[in-house]
């Protein structure tokens, strides 16, 4: 019998000591997988910024900022994206990763802007490009991915980035893909430039 897997995200510690949310309160996400839902507190987060290149049918190339954020209810090794994805080791551990694509013509040096990023596989820019939840059960890690790239995807919703500071990005998420959903607020630490 499958074990109940349910996740949600709450309270994160920001490097500057604040919650990063407007109107008070701690950020949290209600996560549902297979109709089973719960709420979890986030203990740590990290991020990475890069560039995504697109080439259209005529050969024209354009770029956009690609922002990855990883949030977990355990201490992440935030050295880089690979270390943030080290395998989970305990049943209570949960990791949520998202990727946002910015405006057309931006690059890895551009800051992600506040705004709406649609969960629509047909969009190229200002979109949710990836969303996944890692859980641990029966002695192994399971990754549940939302279908964000297949043109026939049933994914709906959006991530609204409401605040970007030197230390953190905050926003609201409401994304559904079949029997999976993530809804609520979030804050993710922004990686410091060397």
Give the location of each predicted region.
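An ectodomain-focused feature that recognizes extracytoplasmic/extracellular
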Residues: 19-149
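Acidic, glycine-rich flexible loop segments
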Residues: 112-193
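A generic structural signal for short, solvent-exposed coil/turn residues
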Residues: 8, 23, 34, 88-90, ...
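C-terminal motif of bacterial Sec signal peptides marking the signal peptidase cleavage site
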Residues: 13-15
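Sec-dependent signal peptide recognition
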Residues: 2-8
């Amino acid at each position: 019998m499958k074990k109940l897997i349910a996740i949600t995200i709450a309270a994160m510690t920001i490097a500057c000591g604040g919650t990063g949310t407007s109107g008070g309160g701690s950020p949290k996400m209600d996560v549902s997988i297979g109709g089973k839902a719960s709420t979890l507190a986030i203990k740590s987060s990290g991020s990475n910024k890069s560039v995504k290149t697109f080439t259209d049918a005529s050969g024209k190339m354009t770029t956009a900022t690609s922002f990855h954020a990883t949030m977990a209810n355990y201490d992440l090794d935030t050295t880089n994206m690979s270390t943030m994805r080290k395998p989970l080791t305990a049943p209570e551990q949960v990791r949520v990763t998202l990727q946002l694509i910015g405006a057309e013509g931006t690059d890895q040096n551009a800051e992600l802007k506040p705004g709406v990023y649609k969960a629509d596989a047909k969009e190229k820019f200002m979109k949710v490009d990836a969303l996944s939840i890692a859980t641990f059960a029966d002695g192994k890690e399971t990754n549940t991915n939302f279908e964000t790239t297949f043109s026939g995807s049933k994914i709906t919703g959006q991530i609204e980035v409401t605040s970007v500071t030197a230390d953190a990005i905050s926003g609201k998420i409401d994304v559904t893909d079949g029997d999976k959903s993530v809804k609520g607020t979030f804050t993710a630490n922004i990686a410091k430039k060397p």
